[in-house]
């Protein structure tokens, strides 16, 4: 595979994640009171919900910013992988608990069942891993 094809694949993965993070962060911020209420109702995070209500959308937007900066893309992909893994772990805990709480994700993602959301997250974890595999480990600051 040519170097440019690898870059295009890495770009597509990064832009998919940017769209996801900007969309969900924006939806959470526009429906802030609902997002806060939903986080407060989750059993394992009630004591930190006041911090998470701000931290989650800020981290999502920060990850998107890192992904857009080509020189910081690998860092953004690692941040994205960490966020998606944490979100997926939480979803797995929710599925295992048998509780029927609403998803606190923003926009149409929030309408998914927990099982659908688990699959959705696993797909985006896969996209992130593909992005890491195909993104260059070193970025040239200038072309010669």
Cite the ranges covered by each PLM segment.
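Membrane-interfacial helix-loop segments of redox and metal-homeostasis proteins
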Residues: 1-144
